[in-house]
Swiss-Prot record:
This is Sodium channel neurotoxin MeuNaTxalpha-4. Negative results: shows no effect on Nav1.2/SCN2A, Nav1.3/SCN3A, Nav1.4/SCN4A, Nav1.5/SCN5A, Nav1.6/SCN8A, Nav1.7/SCN9A and Nav1.8/SCN10A. Has the structural arrangement of an alpha-helix connected to antiparallel beta-sheets by disulfide bonds (CS-alpha/beta). Alpha toxins bind voltage-independently at site-3 of sodium channels (Nav) and inhibit the inactivation of the activated channels, thereby blocking neuronal transmission. This toxin inhibits inactivation of drosophila DmNav1 (EC(50)=130 nM). One of its GO terms (molecular function) is toxin activity. GO terms for cellular component: extracellular region. It is found in: Secreted. Belongs to the long (4 C-C) scorpion toxin superfamily. Sodium channel inhibitor family. Alpha subfamily. Residues 21-85 form the LCN-type CS-alpha/beta domain. It comes from Mesobuthus eupeus (Lesser Asian scorpion).
Amino acid sequence: MNYLILISFALLVITGVESARDAYIAKPHNCVYECFDAFSSYCNGVCTKNGAKSGYCQILGTYGNGCWCIVLPDNVPIRIPGKCHR
């Protein structure tokens, strides 16, 4: 009986948890949203529109100048290693 309660509680916790991550938000074809001004609100707008807490322009980052989002939901595509196919 105790195992049934423990398993039920674990399933409740697992299904109710949504995770998020910090990453470069990706356009279709695995390309980053490019930015050129670190003080512009462009990236923050792109990120928050897609459900992130905030965002900023990462200058000279891994994929060049791109929008970096903080606490981006899992259902939003992020830039992954590999080529950008424009």
